[in-house]
């Protein structure tokens, strides 16, 4: 799909979300992160707070992270 990137949110117990998204917004240790398709590779800690997934149709899903890490690759985003 053009304009999307695969995103996985994984907790210690299970995979919470897996699918294509238009963007991801989360709070990194140094501030707000906005990730879109084609973003440069990144590994960052994330602070406790909402993780907002924007779908291709503009709808949003919001998850709560109690902290963790975000890994961004050209074709995938993983939040642990």
Describe each PLM feature range.
Residues 6-80:
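Compact, glycine-rich, soluble single-domain proteins
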Residues 1-4:
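Short, charged, intrinsically disordered terminal tails
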């Amino acid at each position: 799909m053009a304009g999307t990137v695969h995103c996985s949110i994984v907790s210690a117990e299970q995979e919470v979300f897996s699918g294509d998204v238009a963007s991801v917004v989360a709070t990194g240790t140094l501030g707000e992160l906005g990730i879109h398709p084609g973003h440069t590779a990144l590994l960052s800690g994330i602070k406790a707070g909402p993780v907002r997934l924007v779908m291709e149709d503009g709808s949003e899903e919001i998850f709560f992270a109690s902290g963790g890490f975000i890994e961004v690759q050209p074709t995938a985003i993983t939040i642990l």
